[in-house]
Amino acid sequence: MERIASRNPLIAYEKLEQRLAKRTRLYWLKRFSVAAACIIAIIGLSSLISYIRVGSSAGAPQHITLEANAGIRTHFNLPDGTVVYLNSGSSLSYPMPYDSKERKVCLSGEAYFKVTHNEKQPFIVSAFGDRYNVRVLGTEFNMQAYASEDQISTTLVKGSVNVEVKNKIGKIYKWELKPSEKAVCDIDEGKVLITKVNTIYETAWMEGKLMFKNMPLPQVLKRLSYFYNVKFEIQDPVINSYYFNGTFENKQLSQVLDYLKISSRIDYEIKQAMTDDSQGSQSTMVILRKKKGNE
């Protein structure tokens, strides 16, 4: 398995694959490493934004996985011209070659898709091991599918999409969304709640913005958690009943928390904790508690 640090190195990779197709596996890996080093040198600092992981096993097709580093958002083009915006800590994978009867990708996390129209080759976004699929021909939509959660959401901006859900006993449910509709799915039960939404709030993250309108605080904290790559600990359960309004652009986490402190009478404490891994990396924990008395 090799990594190429890059924001959008797909074209370079495809050319490289053609040149090396007739070489042995060992020689291919050596040449691939050299090409990766060249790409890194050209792209420079943008290599910190995301990377591609190319993996394969004996008898199986190659898969390319594109990942956005924690705390950073990025975008890239797929081979068919579809534009994908990938949120912090998210990943997208697809098989190579990318020329089958359908254009299928797998998402973990959050992404916004501007799908190139092709009636003969449907575009499918899959999550949770094919238990959730969004099928389109050409459209724009936002999708959240975090592995740590039991809900998946799809918000349609333009065009139309078909949502297919397979519950835990294998029963399949299907829905069609219209523009400005958001489908929130319980992946275990296969139940979907469809509501009308302002898509600006659902897609603001693409521009580095956070927008909340009368949103329950637990949902606000989820957004902040993914956006800033932090974890939250609520010490006073009453905080879960709070609602929050606000718009933030290019703000540090502490600035958002300060606003939360003033508007919702919440105290916070930021702690750095060592993660349980071999690299000794740190994670950020934010402890929230209700203000007492006249504080």
Q: Which functions belong to the PLM regions below?
A:
Residues 47-50, 189-192, 226-227:
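Short, composition-biased local secondary-structure segments
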Residues 1-59, 254-295:
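Extreme N-terminal targeting/processing segments
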Residues 193-295:
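N-terminal export/assembly leaders
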